[in-house]
Amino acid sequence: NANRTQIDSFIESINSNYSVFDALKRVKISNDVKEFTHFTFEIIESGKIHCIAAAFTYGREDIIPEMFIEIINELEPANVHCNRLKYYLERHVEIDGDLHGPIAREMVKELCGTDKKKWEEVLNVGRECILKRIQLWDAIHDIIV
């Protein structure tokens, strides 16, 4: 039974027509979690489809399979019995790695074409997404350990 107070407060703020950015200011959560969410919605609000696709591709579809493989590899020798979690992780690795990742990369390629400025923006967004994801996971680690 996780404490959902801040999540419920955030959702309530959104439902009360606060912007995501203002709703984030109202909740008491880790600054790293706020930064990750804020950054994500800044990209969305930019309206630049190639940047949104880059965030999705390089901040999620391309890196999550590797992260989940590491978790699976650490669960097995530790003899941790989490069959549902393991199934969830393995399924994500299979779908994201074999299907979603390649399709997402193709989508970015299609959206950028030969436009050097778009490719530069995609590179910057991808790099920043990975850094924000690392900060998020470090914050989660600090909270639960």
Question: Could you describe each region identified by the protein language model?
Answer:
Residues 1-145:
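Non-heme di-metal
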